[in-house]
Amino acid sequence: MNHKINIVDLGKMDYKSTWDLQIQFQEKVLKGFEQDTLFLVEHEPVYTLGKNANKNNLLKTKSSDVKVYNVERGGDITYHGPGQLVGYPILNLNNYKKNIAWFMRTLELILIDTLAS
């Protein structure tokens, strides 16, 4: 089963604008108005706190300009910043196997293979 995925390089974009774009695209992809898309982006320094985040793990930063966002994902705290390429896949998982463990493992293998080549 092969699916085409749009790859969109957003360049540098702040986290909030990228998050808003993901939410808008998610609706369009689920309704079939847009095809599956992978957004690639570089953020200014930002920390995101997943649903399992322990705020004690967030060390005080040297700069008060670093923003912190609570986000709708699992995990703890993640840092994004300059020089780091971040990928956000917006996919209709109904078109794939409906097993999230399969999806995460497949995504991991694709990234490993891509970086190895």
PLM regions with names:
Residues M1-S117:
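N-terminal lobe of the biotin/lipoate ligase/transferase fold
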